[in-house]
Structures are given as C-alpha cells and as structure tokens.
C-alpha cells in the first residue's frame, strides 16, 4: 500500500473556518517532516514550522457561525450555576500599573508587586500590597480623587482600575507617574514595620481606558473573529466582583483562575462538615471558583450577555501547626525520638516545599522546608567562630535560652539565605493558607479528600449560594452599585433536551436506561479466540491468602464463562503462584516460549509491577491482562458474577473481539466515516522546567484511537511530542496512522473524518484554528481533497454545573444528578461559536461535570442534532462495563493510550533520563517507534482495554 505524503500547497489566502475543498493546486515536492528544535519558544512553533515546510497558509482565527439549536429529545427544565449580569450605566474606567518596593539593606531590594508561584508567597505579597496601597489612598485622598466619587478596583498586585482619571491634570513634563513614600510602621503589618521607606509608584500605560456599558460588552466580547475580542472587559468584571475578597485578606484566600477559599468558613455561614480534617495535619476549606462568561442568554441566537459562573469546591490546606505536631499527624508515631528512614522519607514528601516560620528571634522569620535531616539536635554539631564545636541543642540553650522539649527529634532542613540549614521541628510552624500540592499527598489523605470533595448537587448548590453571599456578590454591594454592575440573585433556569437511551446489540438487543444496561446471556458480537499457549499466574506478598487452588478455581470459572460468550479457549499451559522478585523472570521465559496471553492476578498492595507488565507486553507482543486479587476473591469466594463478566469483556476486547455494537437507527455511525479521539498526557507537574534545563527529554504524550479497523471498534496508539506545545504538530502522525489503517482494513478512503480533541483550553482555540486545523487539512488533502473534516474540542475544564429542576436532599448521586442524554446547545453556550454541552453518563458520586463540545471546523455543515446524536451514541461504545461514559469512547480510549504511553515512557527512563539531542522531533519519532504499538502485532487490538 503506497503512503500518501501531504502535498505542499503554494501560498494561498487564509481559509475561513468553513470551506469547500479548495480547487486543484500546483503540486510541489514534499518536504520531510523534520525535527522541531530543542527548545520551542512558543506553544505553536512545531506546528508553524511544519506548515511552512508544506507551504500551507495559517488559518483565520475565526469561529464558525452557530447553527440552529437541535430539536431531538424531550424538553427538560434545568437549573444552572450561571448568574446573569446587567450593566445598568455607562462607566469609563482607567487602568494603572502599581509598583511597590523597599530597600532591605544597601544592596538588597524587595519588590512586593512581583508575581509569585507558591501559595504562601502569593497570599503574603497580596496582603502586604493591600496594606501599602490602601494606606496610600487614605493618606492621599486628593491624588486618588476620593472627593470626586472615584471608585477603586485593585487586584492586590500590580493592576489598578479607577473611575476617575488620576492623571487628568498633567504636570509640565506630562509625566503620568506618581511615587509615594510609605512608612511600613503605619501599615499595621508586622512584617513591614521595620521598613521606614516603602516606595509605591502608580503609573499609566498607553491606551489605559475602556468604557463599560452593556452595548460595548455586547459588541466586543463574543465576536466570531477571536482577535477582535477585548479580554480587558472580562478582566475588569472579574476584579470588580472579587474586590471584597482582595481587600479582606484575613477572611479570604484568593488564588489563580478566580478561586477563593474561606479561611474561617464556619463564620461565613458554612457547616463544620464542609471543613473536615483529612489527616496528615490537613483540613478542607470550602471555596468558590468564579468566572465571567459571555453567553447567548435566555433570548436565543444572536444575543450576547455577560454572566457570572460560580462553582462550589473544596481543597485541602495544611494546618497552621508546629512541624513536630505535623510529623506526628503524618506518621501516627511519636517523633520525639527520631523517625526511621522509611517513615522520614514519607513525612519529608508531605512537608517539602512548605513555608514555615519561627518566632524565637522575637520576629517572624519565614523559611522554606527542603526535607527532614536524619539526625537530631543533640547529635548534630557545628563549628563556632572561635573554633569550638557545639550541638544544635546547646546552641539554642546558650543563644536563645531555649531548652528544647524534643532534643532527640529529627531536625528540619530549610533554605536559609540560599543554603540548607537545620532547625528544631518544635520551633518551626507551618504558615497558613497553603494548599496541599500533588507531591504532598498521601494515599489515605488523597482518598479521603476526593471523597469529601465529591459533594452531591444539593450540597453544591448550598455552597454556591452561601459563598456568593459571603464574598458579597449581592445587590447591596456599594462598589458594584456605583459601577452599575448588577448580578442577579437567582441562577439562570434553562430548557435542555433529554435524548433517548440507546439500543445495545448483543446476540439479542437490550435498551440502556439511565446510562446502564445488563448484558443478556449469549455470545459476543465477535468472540475472540484465546491463543493456544496461555498461562495464569498469581503474584502476592506473603500472607495475601490466595492459593494455587484459588488460581485454578478462577481459571475454571473464567474458561466456562468465555465459552458461554462464544470465545474459543483451551485450558492454560501453566498456572502458578510467584513472588514479586520472580514473576518478571517467569513472564520473560514464557514470552520466549511463544506464549501469547497471560492472565495475571496481582496483590492489591503491589503497584509497581503493572507498568513492568505493560512494557514487557509491548516488547514481546504477549498480551498481559492484570487484575487485582480483591477482584479475584470477589469472583472465587463471593461468587460475584458481574465482576467475572467485566473481566471477560476485557479479555475479549484485548484479544481483538467485539462485545456488542450500538444500534444506529439515526444513521450517525455510517461506514464511510473515520472517527478519531485525540488525548494528551502532559509531563508530570513540576518536571518540565527541571528536565528542560538539564537537557533531558520530557515529552508530552499524544494518545489517539479510531474506528479505522472496524466501524464499532476503537483501537489506537500514542506518539511522543515536544512538551509545552498548545497545538499538536503530531496531528500529522495521528492522521497518517489512522487513515492508512482505515484504508488497509476498509479498502477505501473515508469520506469524512471526525476528530474529538481534548487537552485544549478556550485560550488555545485561536492557535488551533490558525495552525493545527490547517495542518490537519493539508495531511488529509494529501490523500484526497474530497475528504471532509469535522474538528471538535472537548473539555471538562470549565465551571458550569447543571442540576435537576427539583432537588430532594438525601437521595443517591444517580438520582439527584441530571440523567445521561441531557444536551444544551443554546442559552448557556458562547454566542460566537458552534457549541453544545452533552451529559453522556450516570454520575455515581458527587455532582455531574458535563463536557463542553466546541466545533472548530465543520466542512459538512452538520446540524446540531446530527453531532449530538453521534456524540451520545459514541458514549455507549466502552465495551467493558455496561455503562455509558462521560466522553465519547474514541476520546476515552485515546486518553487511556496517552496514560499507557506515559507508563511505557516511565519504564524506558527508569535507568536514567534520556538526553535531548539537537533534533528533538526526530529523536522522539525514533523513541515512539521503540515503545509504541505501530511496529507490533498489537496495533489492531485495543490492548489497553
């Protein structure tokens, strides 16, 4: 089969987002898809470079015009968490920059308005900036035009808005800058009182005025041409609505993306149960996430209305407590006589990176924790200036007259003036207002946090209303009244539609009800054949209570059930029990003996082996199905038939079978279309900067899955791509792999390609329209100019929540949440683009998070009903459990391939990082070949089922 290289195009004008296929163009010789350079300077470099090589113009940064809302399904009233905003008058606001700094010494300066990353630093600087700035306002009312009724909106850092121009009467030099000298002692902030001269500068940038009016908001915020929309209106509204929180730093913790947490929650009207202790010296704080969104509103197409979307949430914070107490909470052991190495490492991971403070020098001194030292204050000695040595315990007794209560406890390692120093844990206190980061979580605490944060719809609604009142987003807020900003008290009610359940086709058909169904007895649609050479092994720690008899009993039940489903299976060649040390050697041995399938039963406590199984599977092409011993016990000892059914569903799909299809009465799943899901696994948090600086490869992993093999079967692979890219040059590899496989299996090219793409925020839509979609079209047109493209971005990273109209407390999550099939394609959608929300699944815990689908390209001009019906149908193709999924199966499977790619990359780099050579793109292509599935026999099987 000959490959189809993309044909480079001569330069042409930018394409509008909806185009007929361009006419014939002069072909030019293809340029090889070469290397992206080692460090990309923007998130689009790789895509832009490839477009230039192919001589393809960038696309226009234009959304598609919304089409008429869909009509299928029955109407349902839905409550939202969207509060309408009315701008009742015209107000001109002026933006100024604020800069606050002070000299600590003759050579060292501190800048308070500098942006920070760590929670404590962000909160601390905001607190100080507010103290400094509002003192300046109080002492200089003439400059700040307070008598003229000036309204001030300040972000607690470097941005200030006022309703009166502060520089209307310029001095002779026309300087738009004013510097105030502030005495830190007057601010009321203990940390500032030793600074007699703090410099606060206010200056005006160019073009620093906008006029806030309902007309301007309507015209300048939701245009199809993304580049003409003015983000400053959004920024100003968000700041105005957050002003109460910014000024009251002792009550509210303000964080990124409109998040606010309540530091004294019970005083703000929250329940004690909203603030539970989750272990490790950590406590949940309730909070809100507030975002300004421009929506169509209740009056339909062509309207643009500002709104405030408020979601309730909780996050774990570190308690303000001594580090010694924190160590006790983490370990459950008395730390006064020191911790053993394993416990110390566990505790160190939880406190590393935290800000803590001491007060024994008669002032508050902040330091950052780096770890826990293996020795105590009595055993750690250091040299004094006179050449003598003394222990840390003696030093504190002599210098500070402190007799340590726990002299044999481990010391804490802190960064102090650039060096690591050692401090008694009892004298250091964890600073408040620090959220628990992912590396600081422990298993138990993480589980408890997840459970407590998954609140039911009635609780979430209570949190939203309580929080909205606490942050003073009310009709009585004087600042908002003065600015003419009115936020409605009641959230928007909208009419959604509920699509019908689906018919699942096994040997006989069943209907889904509320996203669930029971598979009928009888054969799979396409039963697989289990390879003749297969084995079953259990691996466990001593005392895991799973015997060889249990293995054989499970295997007997497994074979019996496989046969009932029509699968061809013989008894295994071998069964056995192995220790963790010996199992990998055994698997290597049987793989070398041409064994093609192994059923592994692994102790729940053993988590490191799974990745090793998968690396061996990819390398040897011996399929390894891994299940937990708890699941095996549920089958063997508790007789759980459904668990066994799910295991066999997995086996059949892994071996290339198909369990069921979805009836396609509406003809949305036609044979001539290729449906591709594309998911992204970004490098682990915090590793990008570190790895890039050391010249190590740290790729993002693009998973993809499509129905290239057969219409209802979704199989895929992954590619390694440079990290830090908003647009995917790898869309080229994804499309070539998928189209080639489609042509190989279907003996024809697809007429339509539908891409569901995740991992893209609204902010990257413009770049995807400009670079990624033109690249995708160029690759597709290399096969045929007749193939049409539909490109849909899918995200759950938004703040919208939808609730049933009538909520009764005390029910289950499945009863209280909106049902599967709820679709919304007007009222709450962005008026500039073709968009819909579709709830595909039954929510088993917490409150439903309904995915948002934005159609960025549609050559077919598909009606909304058609896209919604296809998407909902695709939510029923999971094959393993008898439940619909929240996102379409191709995207779900693609995300699993991205995770699998991350695991295989992790195994590849266990022996050490891989150096980034000059041509990073080529190196990543080679490594993709090495650890991906394309070169293996598994590339047509869904091995990650």
Curated annotation (Swiss-Prot):
<dbReference type="GO" id="GO:0017151">
    <property type="term" value="F:DEAD/H-box RNA helicase binding"/>
</dbReference>
<comment type="similarity">
    <text>Belongs to the Argonaute family. WAGO subfamily.</text>
</comment>
<keyword id="KW-0943">RNA-mediated gene silencing</keyword>
<dbReference type="GO" id="GO:0005737">
    <property type="term" value="C:cytoplasm"/>
</dbReference>
<feature type="region of interest" description="Disordered">
    <location>
        <begin position="1"/>
        <end position="41"/>
    </location>
</feature>
<dbReference type="InterPro" id="IPR003165">
    <property type="entry name" value="Piwi"/>
</dbReference>
<dbReference type="GO" id="GO:0003727">
    <property type="term" value="F:single-stranded RNA binding"/>
</dbReference>
<dbReference type="InterPro" id="IPR036085">
    <property type="entry name" value="PAZ_dom_sf"/>
</dbReference>
<keyword id="KW-0217">Developmental protein</keyword>
<dbReference type="InterPro" id="IPR036397">
    <property type="entry name" value="RNaseH_sf"/>
</dbReference>
<dbReference type="GO" id="GO:0036464">
    <property type="term" value="C:cytoplasmic ribonucleoprotein granule"/>
</dbReference>
<dbReference type="GO" id="GO:0016442">
    <property type="term" value="C:RISC complex"/>
</dbReference>
<dbReference type="InterPro" id="IPR012337">
    <property type="entry name" value="RNaseH-like_sf"/>
</dbReference>
<feature type="compositionally biased region" description="Pro residues">
    <location>
        <begin position="1"/>
        <end position="20"/>
    </location>
</feature>
<dbReference type="InterPro" id="IPR003100">
    <property type="entry name" value="PAZ_dom"/>
</dbReference>
<dbReference type="GO" id="GO:0004521">
    <property type="term" value="F:RNA endonuclease activity"/>
</dbReference>
<protein>
    <recommendedName>
        <fullName>Argonaute protein wago-1</fullName>
    </recommendedName>
</protein>
<dbReference type="GO" id="GO:0005634">
    <property type="term" value="C:nucleus"/>
</dbReference>
<feature type="domain" description="PAZ">
    <location>
        <begin position="322"/>
        <end position="432"/>
    </location>
</feature>
<dbReference type="Pfam" id="PF02171">
    <property type="entry name" value="Piwi"/>
</dbReference>
<dbReference type="Pfam" id="PF02170">
    <property type="entry name" value="PAZ"/>
</dbReference>
<dbReference type="GO" id="GO:0043186">
    <property type="term" value="C:P granule"/>
</dbReference>
<feature type="domain" description="Piwi">
    <location>
        <begin position="636"/>
        <end position="899"/>
    </location>
</feature>
<comment type="function">
    <text>Argonaute protein which is involved in the endogenous small interfering RNA (endo-siRNA) pathway. Interacts with secondary 22G-RNAs, which are RNA-dependent RNA polymerase-derived endo-siRNAs, typically 22 nucleotides in length with a 5'guanosine residue. In the germline, functions in a genome surveillance system to silence transposons and aberrant transcripts.</text>
</comment>
<comment type="subunit">
    <text>Interacts with rde-12. Interacts with znfx-1.</text>
</comment>
<dbReference type="GO" id="GO:0035198">
    <property type="term" value="F:miRNA binding"/>
</dbReference>
<dbReference type="GO" id="GO:0035194">
    <property type="term" value="P:regulatory ncRNA-mediated post-transcriptional gene silencing"/>
</dbReference>
